[in-house]
């Protein structure tokens, strides 16, 4: 995977002997066909289960490798983007998985930033959905500008000045970011460096979508439905994602969650020969 272009030895899409991997109580094992080295069989399975072949569909599976596909009928284009782990809470100062104590929802209510915590417990950090919400809220409140820079002093709306504070800057020669941070919940904050990492992840996904539009020769207005697959895609607030530029704003009304589409596709193929042949 470290060389470009990475060409896998096999694209699968066939039946295997379960005994080869030590599965003794299984009659047949099938592995969905991969599209390329970075677009695997999970995308094939998910699209088979959710994509309407007659309508132009944009399929997103957001994760460390943001895999996506666009098309209809017998023509699809796909790509994978190096979004990195920021949306999963990794490499964020107070980032964490979506578990007990994670702030998973953030919104603006009047002059206050409000939040929800998984398990209704003491807030410990921010998971992916909370991070996306937080960025959208900071932008809406005028706490960050359109470039993602945390504002200070007279630049800040007076109602939100108490949310911004200074943290100890890391003593690294490479760090050029300010030492400002923003309170989200008691003991939980987001730093300028965190925002930059989230911008990189967001930019990778947005760039992938733009490339698909260019390759397919279409525009956002041509899309019939935007589907979000996978666990993370089910939980992010689509309005917040559109507000920070993860996908075009005009697709917001066309966005929907399709659950664990790859798992559902695998079940369909296991139970139906017709579904497996279609994959």
Report the location of each language-model feature.
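Phosphate/pyrophosphate-binding loops at sites that engage ATP/ADP/AMP, CoA/4′-phosphopantetheine
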Residues: 209-224
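Glycine-rich phosphate-binding loops at beta-strand->alpha-helix junctions
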Residues: 220-240
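Short, well-ordered loop/turn and helix-capping segments at boundaries between secondary-structure elements
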Residues: 71-74, 82, 109, 137-145, ...
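Glycine-rich phosphate-binding/hydrolytic loop that grips phosphoryl groups
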Residues: 41-49, 202-203, 255-279
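Acidic-enriched catalytic cores of C-N bond-cleaving enzymes acting on peptides and small amides
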Residues: 78-190
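Glycine-rich phosphate-binding loop of actin/hexokinase-like ATP-binding domains
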Residues: 1-15, 30, 45-130, 237-259
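ATP-dependent carbohydrate kinase catalytic cores
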Residues: 2-81, 110, 152-208
């Amino acid at each position: 995977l470290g060389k470009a272009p990475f060409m896998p030895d096999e694209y699968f899409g066939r039946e295997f002997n379960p005994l080869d991997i030590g599965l003794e109580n299984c009659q047949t094992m099938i592995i969905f066909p991969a599209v390329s080295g970075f677009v695997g069989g999970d995308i094939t399975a998910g699209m088979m289960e959710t994509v309407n072949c007659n309508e132009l569909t944009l399929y997103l599976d957001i994760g460390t490798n943001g895999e996506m596909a666009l098309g209809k009928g017998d023509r699809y284009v796909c790509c994978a983007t190096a979004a990195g782990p920021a949306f999963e809470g990794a490499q964020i100062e107070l980032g964490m998985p979506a578990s007990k104590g994670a702030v998973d929802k953030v919104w603006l209510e009047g002059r206050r930033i409000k939040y929800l915590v998984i398990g209704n417990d003491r807030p410990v950090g921010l998971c992916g959905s909370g991070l996306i919400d937080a960025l959208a809220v900071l932008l809406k409140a005028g706490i960050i500008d359109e470039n993602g820079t945390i504002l200070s002093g007279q630049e800040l709306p007076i109602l939100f000045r108490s949310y911004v504070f200074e943290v100890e800057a890391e003593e690294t020669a490479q760090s050029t970011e300010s030492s400002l941070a923003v309170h989200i919940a008691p003991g939980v904050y987001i730093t300028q460096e965190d925002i930059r990492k989230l911008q990189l992840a967001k930019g990778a996904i947005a760039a992938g979508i733009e490339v698909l539009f260019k390759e397919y020769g279409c525009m956002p207005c041509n899309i019939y439905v935007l589907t979000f697959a996978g666990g993370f895609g089910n939980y992010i607030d689509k309005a917040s994602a559109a507000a920070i530029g993860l996908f075009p704003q005009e697709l917001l009304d066309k966005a929907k969650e399709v659950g664990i589409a790859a798992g559902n596709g695998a079940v369909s193929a296991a139970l139906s020969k017709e579904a497996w042949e279609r994959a």
